[in-house]
Amino acid sequence: MPNDNRLAPAALAAQAAALPAAWRHVLEQPAVARAFASVLGHVEQRLAEGAVVYPAAPFRALDQLAPADVRVVILGQDPYHGPGQAQGLAFSVPDDCKCPPSLRNIFNEIAVDYPRPTRHDLSAWTRQGVLLLNTSLTVEDGQPGSHAKRGWETVTDALIAEVARDPSPKVFLLWGAHAQAKQALVPADAGHLVLAANHPSPLSARRPPVPFVGCGHFRQTNAWLQQRGQKPVDWSGEQNNASRQGEFAL
């Protein structure tokens, strides 16, 4: 039986209200508040009409991270639209789910330089300051992109811009044209690193202009962070094993 990851009525508003203050401040900006109200109204209407909406926790990517805690940003587009998949973290699925093709290619790229991750749930990355943010935070069952034009991008653009305004050094990993369009939200003089490549989907991972396969983003990210006095990210997801930390250093 798949994990029940359906969004419950009224849960979206409650989760937004429970976000850390730094994120709530973004949602309270007038233009963002209007966009979120539009999203919220549409989601609640669709739930009332019997639609199945995923995930159960749309704001999960923000729950444990304030903007100052973010060290790496990985942008996705749409939550997974099948039952038991989407968790509120871009690219992540529960461990008992089959590994999606894009995530498999991400793991293949990590394995070039580091131990291959064994868990499909990427929560361990989040605990290390990796923001796994989709640009649309809800989707209907079997209908990819179904909420993409309902106001979510105004909300998530504002969240990305807030992260980029924070002065602590961050790496933005922009995979595919959709994510790369968000580079405009990261000021060139902000002191952050932006790395771009094709999307890890099998349809594009090996294609020009910058194939995802062989991009080296995970090692480049760690090298850049360490040069600025920060710990490397344990991309294997086993950061609690201190004896392995050296495997992720330069």
From Swiss-Prot:
Its main location: cytoplasm. It is an enzyme of class 3 (hydrolase). Keywords: Cytoplasm, DNA damage, DNA repair, Hydrolase. GO terms for molecular function: uracil DNA N-glycosylase activity. The keyword DNA repair applies. Residues 228-250 are annotated as: Disordered. It is found in: Cytoplasm. GO terms for cellular component: cytoplasm. It catalyses: Hydrolyzes single-stranded DNA or mismatched double-stranded DNA and polynucleotides, releasing free uracil. Excises uracil residues from the DNA which can arise as a result of misincorporation of dUMP residues by DNA polymerase or due to deamination of cytosine. This is Uracil-DNA glycosylase. It comes from Bordetella pertussis (strain Tohama I / ATCC BAA-589 / NCTC 13251).
